[in-house]
C-alpha cells in the first residue's frame, strides 16, 4: 500500500485504486477518507457525485465533514452533502481546536440546546437573506411559505425586522411562528 506521485494509490498487490474509497488514519488517530476516480487519480478540491450522493474533497483530497466552503454548505458525519431542513449547531459555535471540524453532536442524542434550523437548497447551499444590506434578517420562500433567516442562515421565530431602512417602523416587522412560518 503506497502513494504514487501524491495523487494515486496502489494496494499491497500493486494494483492502482480506481472508483474506490480509501480510509486512512492520520497522525492523531483520526480517520480520513479519500476517493479515487476512474482514472485512478485522487479527487481533490471539488464536489464529486458518488452513488447518487454528493461529497466535497479538500485540496489534499480528504473528504470534508461539517460546515464547509465559508460555512455555506454542510456535510454530515458520513460526508454526504445535506439538503432541506437540518437542525444543527451554528458554524461559529463549533469547537475549532483542530484544523478540521468534526460534527460529533450529530446523531449523538444530545439535547437541542444550541441547535438551530437551517435550510439547504437542492444544490446544498444554505439559505441566507437574499440582500445582505437588508439588515440582520431576511425572508425566503420555501414550499409556498415564508421563513425568516438571520445572516448566518439560522431560522428565526417571533417578531423580526425584515426590511432595511434607517427608521424602525412597525411596517418593517413580520411575525414568524414556532414552526418558522410567517403568520
Q: Where do the model's predicted regions map?
A:
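Extracellular adhesion/carbohydrate-binding repeat motifs centered on closely spaced tryptophans
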Residues: 1-183
Amino acid at each position: 500500500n503506497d502513494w504514487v506521485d501524491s495523487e494515486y494509490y496502489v494496494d499491497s498487490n500493486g494494483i492502482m485504486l480506481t472508483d474506490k474509497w480509501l480510509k486512512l488514519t492520520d497522525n492523531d488517530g483520526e480517520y480520513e477518507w479519500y476517493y479515487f476516480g476512474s482514472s485512478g487519480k485522487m479527487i481533490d478540491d471539488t464536489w464529486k457525485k458518488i452513488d447518487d450522493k454528493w461529497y466535497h474533497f479538500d485540496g489534499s483530497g480528504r473528504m470534508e465533514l461539517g460546515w464547509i466552503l465559508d460555512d455555506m454548505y454542510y456535510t454530515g458525519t458520513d460526508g454526504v452533502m445535506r439538503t432541506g431542513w437540518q437542525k444543527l449547531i451554528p458554524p461559529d459555535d463549533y469547537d475549532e481546536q483542530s484544523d478540521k471540524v468534526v460534527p460529533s453532536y450529530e446523531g449523538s442524542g444530545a439535547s437541542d440546546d444550541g441547535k438551530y434550523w437551517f435550510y439547504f437548497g437542492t444544490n446544498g447551499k444554505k439559505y441566507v437573506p437574499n440582500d445582505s444590506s437588508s439588515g440582520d434578517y431576511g425572508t425566503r420562500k420555501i414550499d409556498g411559505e415564508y421563513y425568516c433567516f438571520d445572516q448566518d442562515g439560522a431560522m428565526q421565530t417571533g417578531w423580526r425586522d425584515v426590511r432595511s431602512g434607517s427608521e424602525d417602523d412597525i411596517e418593517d416587522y413580520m411575525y414568524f411562528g414556532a414552526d418558522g412560518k410567517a403568520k
